[in-house]
Amino acid sequence: QRQMCIRDREYVEAGRDMAESEIAAKFLQDAGYDMLNCDNGTYDAWYWAHPPVYMPENCNLAEVEHIKKFVDIPVVCAGRMTLDAAAEAIAAGRLDGAGFARNFLADPEWFTKVLEDREDDIRPCILCHNGCFNMCHYKGVPNDQDLSDSLHLARCAVNAEMMQWDKHYIKKTNDPKTVHIVGGGIGGMEAARVLTLRGHKPIIYEKSGVLGGTFIAASSESYKGKLRDLLTWYRREMEKLGVEVRLNTEVK
């Protein structure tokens, strides 16, 4: 954490440094902790513990590996961890475990698909915080909330069913219809996906030559690879489900 720098005043660092964290880790171990789940974040720098798309992959790994040297209990790292980096660090003994959470919000079958070598089928988390943070009703301390309210902390922008199963769920129809969808962006493709799973026949009309809509431009920055992964996933879903897509077709 850094204090605000005001013009003509000396700039100073504030917050816990690594030396203090080394002592704190040993103190917690001596106090009886069974495991340490570590990251660089604080309440004032939450984005280290819950990295958005702007943060690099494995952004906490080096510091957590360092902390492990000072304790004998298991040490776990989370925060935009990749499976390869986690597996390599654990195999080398520099880490005892890795934490993954948002992956399961976006796709509850995430790790099952990894084990079955079906990674192309995984609906990716796009690290947007629009569901798991912005849609929640968090008031500061979960214990001060009704359980029914705090449950909303686990929503997901790319998975409408997550923690809203009584509201958003896919049920087979007894009255199949042909549904014409104007626009092949993310919304159009999601509508087509759900309609197909329900037993309807959607037809997408897209005036350009490619599916994606404005999400193509929105995902164009170099650091937004996860957004491009979501586009790839949706396009693949359209092919897998056999959705009829009419490109270069404008509906007036």
Write out the residue ranges for each language-model feature.
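Short, intrinsically disordered, charge-balanced linker/junction segments flanking boundaries
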Residues: Q1-I6, V245, T249-K252
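Flavin-dependent oxidoreductase catalytic cores
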Residues: Q1-V182, I186, E190-P202, V210
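Acidic, amphipathic alpha-helical patches
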Residues: A86, Y234, K252
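Short gly/ser/thr-rich secondary-structure transition/capping motifs
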Residues: E161-D166, V243-T249
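Beta1-alpha1 glycine-rich phosphate/pyrophosphate-binding loop at the start
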Residues: I181-N248
